[in-house]
Amino acid sequence: MRNTSKELQGATHRYAPCDWYYHVPVKRSEKAVDAPPASQIPGLSNLGDSHSENLPGTRRYWIKETDSEYVKLAKQGGRPDLLKHFAPGTRKGSPVAYSLPDWYIHHSKPPTASQQEVRAVSMPDYMVHEEFNPDQANGSYASRRGPFDFDMKTVWQREAEELEKEKKKLRLPAIDSKYLSKAGTPLGPKNPAGSRLSFPPVPGQKNSSPTNFSKLISNGYKDEWLQQQQRADSDKRTPKTSRASVLSQSPRDLEGPQDAARLQDAEASEGPEDTPESSQSPEESVSASTPAELK
């Protein structure tokens, strides 16, 4: 905060300090001052030894107003038997042992040794084995359960219970063949196989060899498929080309009875429209096929 009232006093005091901000320390005196004692408790510091004056005179200035009650008591030498407890009425005598107050115990007079109950030492229940006595057992007796093993039955008891459960199961009577003959045959198709449902085979489910991944990655299956397509196309084209080649051969080129028989088979395979032409003799067919200039 700026104090404007002191700005006009001069350039050196332009920014005067605020009185409320901090306290200006008092100027220190240049006189020698004795160092304070290391401890104010008597016997723990050399304050009494350093002075040459009489001890009672020096102890007079040990106690200060700023000292606490405990420090003042310690400087005076303390109180004798400060931590001892004196029973009421015996304060002037010798100190006695600490006695319990009346409010600390439940009864005013503690029981004597003869009145105290003798505690019986007993083992825990899970460490004591007691034989079962049916005479002493009541109707509400229940055997104790073990801490770990919860199966209280023997092997023979368990087998007997399982046999009883199997006997109690509901069993249907056996089917007699006499009743089946009296009831007659059920209505329906005679062929039992016809009544079964049959589904067509799903495409793609063939019992083939497992997939070869190296062949799959290198497009080997693709090449096989293309080769199969080419073979199928070539098989479709071969009968047409063989038939055309047989028909294009002339009787002069035919050698032997095999070629003649092949020509007759090719002519017979033609449709009914070509029957009149096929009825002609080989000489007429040859003359018809030759041009007029060569005749």
UniProtKB/Swiss-Prot annotation:
PANTHER family assigned: CHROMOSOME 7 OPEN READING FRAME 57, SI:DKEY-276J7.1
tRNA processing as UniProt keyword: no
Composition bias type Acidic residues, residue spans: 267-276
Keywords: Phosphoprotein
Positions where Phosphoserine occurs in the chain: S50
Pfam families, per the entry: DUF5524
Region (Disordered): 33-52, 180-295
InterPro entries registered for this protein in UniProt: DUF5524
The protein's name in its UniProt record: Uncharacterized protein C7orf57
Domain of life: Eukaryota
Polar residues bias: start-end ranges: 205-217, 241-251
Feature: compositional bias, Low complexity: 277-289
Claim: Acetylation is one of the keywords in the record: no
Gene, per the UniProt record: C7orf57
